[in-house]
Design a protein with these regions (language model features):
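Aromatic "clamp/platform" in nucleotide-sugar-dependent glycosyltransferases that forms part
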Residues: 277
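Acceptor-binding helix/loop patch of EC 2.4 sugar-transfer enzymes
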Residues: 61-73, 116-151
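Short alpha-helical donor nucleotide-sugar binding micro-motif in glycosyltransferases
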Residues: 157, 264-269
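A charged, aromatic-enriched C-terminal amphipathic alpha-helix characteristic of glycosyltransferases
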Residues: 339-370
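Membrane-proximal helix-turn-helix segments that form the acceptor-binding/catalytic region
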Residues: 83-92, 104-106, 125, 139-163
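Short hydrophobic beta-strand element within catalytic cores of glycosyltransferases
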Residues: 294-299
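Conserved donor-binding/catalytic core segment of Leloir-type glycosyltransferases
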Residues: 192, 199-218, 224-229, 235
């Protein structure tokens, strides 16, 4: 019996590299088309036979984009070129999985040849995402979501047979824009438990940690206010995006580090904080849970979904609104939760549902169902 052929299209690694690896384990014939070099993809567990890297074909465009990193037009050119290049070289497949907004030509071509088209959408419906971001005062005089991005996203939604999304609030945003619910597949992202785990007896040098881009989108302006109000010690690990990092007592910044080093930073803190205003399901939250840090998240960070995936959901606190006072209140709750942990692993055996293996099995079950339905 021939294996089901699946092409996965992505500009970079993202979570779909993990998806490609897991679908290969589940018996599918997978090809991962991206500009990630094969050797780098293999470092994240992708088998060599799954990689269909177009790095060398894209190298001139990647180089130009790096030289002129602030040019939006060049970034759009790179996206369009990759879309067409992938469309020309990709093999025929039963299913194509593509990152939304990045690919339109290639999926359209694949659909003409009989492929089922699944788009991966990591954030809210593009119109809702634009509304949320435009409501942030910092973006009042700019366009946080360019019109061309909206156009390509909406084309993706029309072209899709299904859209895979990571959380309840993303699902609700599509419902608000009357997207057919039977074409939505909710599947929370996973975490690699070999990279993230509690380290016993490690000194807790910080009260609070946040990992990820330092930005208004992730609520970092609220973090600054809340840390000043509470006097807690704070560690940030990641890049600086659109908010200056405070150079004052109580605030420590570390730049971007290799994923395998992150566990040592998580374990130096007591609790994890992410009051994100708009994010599908921030994977750093699952990483923090795997390290057994009580979590403070938002209704728009995917934290509510994670509450349903641990044995002791009370150790995940959701901020009531996007104000510094609400973050302060949630921090107090989380700090009390930390004191009550007393060595317990609050995810319990349910941590298995937060792994990439579980994510891949849920996806495999979904694929087998829709492929069977197509044949009927």
């Amino acid at each position: 019996m021939n294996k089901v052929r699946i092409n996965i299209l992505s500009p970079g690694r993202f979570h779909v590299c993990d998806l490609a690896r897991e679908l290969d384990k589940n018996g599918f014939d997978v090809k991962f088309y991206s500009f990630v070099p094969t050797k780098r993809a293999m470092k994240f567990g992708l088998p060599k036979h799954c990689s269909a890297s177009i790095f060398f074909l894209m190298f001139p465009f990647l180089g130009i984009c790096k030289l002129f990193s602030r040019s939006f037009k060049l970034r759009r050119l790179r996206i369009n070129v990759q879309d067409y290049v992938t469309g020309f070289i990709m093999r025929r497949a039963d299913v194509m999985i593509a990152m939304s907004g990045d690919f339109v030509y290639a999926p359209k071509k694949a659909k003409q040849k009989g492929s089922l088209i699944i788009y991966e959408r990591g954030s809210k419906h593009i119109l809702e995402q634009r509304r949320v971001l435009e409501s942030i005062p910092y973006f009042s005089k700019s366009k946080p979501v360019p019109d061309i991005n909206v156009v390509r996203e909406l084309k993706s939604y029309q072209l899709a047979d299904y859209i895979a999304i990571p959380s309840k609030h993303v699902y609700e945003s599509f419902m608000e824009h009357t997207y057919p619910k039977e074409r939505l597949f909710v599947n929370p992202y996973g975490v690699d438990l070999s990279d993230f785990y509690p380290i016993r007896d490690m000194e807790k040098r910080y009260d609070v940690i946040m990992v990820g881009g330092w930005s208004y989108r992730k609520g970092c302006d609220l973090i600054i206010e809340a840390i000043r109000l509470t006097g807690l010690s704070f560690l940030h690990v990641g890049g600086l995006v659109d908010i200056p990092f405070p150079e004052e007592k109580g605030f420590t910044h570390v730049g971007i580090v290799d994923q395998k080093q992150l566990v040592h930073y998580y374990n130096q803190a007591k609790i994890f904080l992410l009051p994100s205003r708009e994010e599908g399901l921030a994977m750093v939250q699952a990483q923090a849970i795997a390290c057994n840090l009580p979590l403070v998240g938002s209704s728009d960070s995917g934290a509510e979904d994670l509450q349903q995936m641990v044995e002791l959901p009370e150790f995940i606190t959701i901020i009531e609104n996007y104000t510094a006072d609400a973050v302060v209140s949630a921090l107090h709750t989380a700090m009390m939760n930390y004191e009550q942990l007393q060595g317990r692993i609050y995810a319990g055996n349910a941590i298995k549902e937060l792994t990439w293996e579980a994510y891949g099995k849920r996806y495999a079950t979904f694929l087998n169902r829709i492929i069977t339905e197509k044949k009927m």
